[in-house]
């Protein structure tokens, strides 16, 4: 849910007024940590659904979450198939995949929320929730993503081959930071809402399966 600030910028309503510090979502989250007097976790955030409603991530408490920024026109878009396979195979054991479309990487998610929903349904028969389009980097980054990045900065480096070379040449300022590097970055969240691990875009859903199985059987 959003509320207007003094400068007209829309602010996440879960932040009290004194936590709204001028367009820095990560800092806002840290201020909110102190104000509420307890550690923040992923369940403390609300997100916007594709039809404009608000969903409280606390609804997923007790489930293992895999949070992914997705895109419809990316070379990694076929990962939807693997994500859906994970979701179908493990949802009855407590897994919930959550997709967040983003157009910040090569403008590879240009469609409306309705068009994205149609694409996911017709192209990959996606049954896990795909939310409204968000920014994941920059001053307008969704507060959930500011939190995820701060909790798991990632290990992105030369070992990621062609993707590293692409990011290093096109967005060199992102190297060595907690920024999301490309579409299909994945965050694993435990049933208590804590960030366990970040997987860079080229790590496939199938490569994550062992980690999911271990957490779901713990």
Question: What is the role of each PLM region?
Answer:
Residues 42-43, 65, 183-185:
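Short loop/turn microsegments at loop-to-beta-strand junctions
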Residues 197-217:
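Non-catalytic, surface beta->alpha helical segment in thiol-disulfide oxidoreductase systems
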Residues 35-58, 78, 155:
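N-terminal "domain-start" segment that seeds a small globular fold
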Residues 119-202:
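Thiol/selenol-based redox catalytic cores and closely related redox-interacting motifs
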Residues 63-64, 72-73, 77-100, 120-124:
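Conserved helix-turn-beta segment immediately C-terminal to the redox Cys motif
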Residues 93-111, 127-138:
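Thiol-based oxidoreductase modules, predominantly thioredoxin-like and allied folds used
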Residues 7, 49, 190:
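Short, acidic, Ser/Thr-enriched surface-loop or helix-capping motifs
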